[in-house]
Amino acid sequence: TKGFFMRGGREMDNHFEVMWDTFRDVPSIETPGVSVLDEYYWLNKHDPNYSLCRATVKCGKDAHTDKKFTLDKESAMALSKLFLTTEEELEDKKISDILPDSFWSTNFWLYWQTMFAFQRWSSALEMKRYLCRYVHHIDGLPDFSALRFTKYNQYESMILPLVKYLEAHNVKIEYGMDVKNVIIETVGDKKIAKQIVYVKDGKEQTIDLVEDDLVFITNGCCTDTSCYGDQTHAPDLSKIKNGAGESWDMWKNIAKQAVHGEFGNPDAFCSDVEATNWMSATVETSNEEIIRHIMNICKRDPREGKVTTGGIVTVKDSTENWYLSWTINRQPQFKSQDK
């Protein structure tokens, strides 16, 4: 049986300035006369997000993280040093190269790794960037009180209104295009995109760019080569190969044009699938026994249409193997969901 699926959830906040500056001009498709930003703001003002149980142990018992970071002095000092270390000093280093062994047993690491999908072998430079970008989240990290969520899944609450807005303004959206390369010309100290190379319907084609064109690309995507399964079929992983994927291949072709490595090294991020992949599942149920277990853990009724878990609930005693977390957003999460 096939149902709904979401590869993950977007953890948003009020300081996604670029995104919200965009959506303040995008009309809601549900409430006439207001913007997507208006909807989002009013919803989270009326129904603020926070978690009542951040982690569990022993089959659903509260792990009592109690909003504490449990950082010892050595870990706290190392974390502060990481925040202040220059990016150049962190290149090609793992988090485990920077932080002490005592850090891995702290609540801070439990919160951090499960919220942002970090592993001990993840990039120390990337962790520093996250620390700097979300420093205002630190106080709300233990209970997700810094986060905001949309009413429905992000496709229906954000992407669909944006697509309808663009189409209403005669923007043509091309689907089914596999972008192979962006030809970049170096003029003095400037890098100028001159041409997009893509494949559509098996045929390689190009788009010539002019001075007023803006080009936005995703140079490497963590969901590239995603595979899907359902209730009776496991995902087919046989075609996934280290270093392969449409966005990664494009980045590699762009990187080849660099004179001094200025377009980065994609191989550093996509050469070990086992270290970077993950599995997610979307479950739809009306089973009363399951709902009772959910209510015992998160102290809220998911059928009320309000914040339920308030973010992920991590099964703390699974972190040595599965790193299993689960979440229930406002219901219904999909407009076509059964009541």
Language-model-detected regions and their locations in the chain:
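Glycine-rich FAD cofactor-binding loop and adjacent beta-loop-alpha segment at the N-terminus
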Residues: 1-29, 36
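Amphipathic alpha-helical segments that form well-ordered structural scaffolds
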Residues: 18-25, 111, 157-168
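Rossmann-like flavin
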Residues: 28-136, 148
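Conserved flavin/dinucleotide-binding core of flavoenzymes
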Residues: 55-56, 61, 269, 274-339
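Short loop/turn segments at strand-loop or loop-helix junctions that form parts
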Residues: 111-119, 137-140, 217-222, 339
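Glycine-rich loop(s) and the adjacent beta-strand/alpha-helix scaffold that form part
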Residues: 199-303
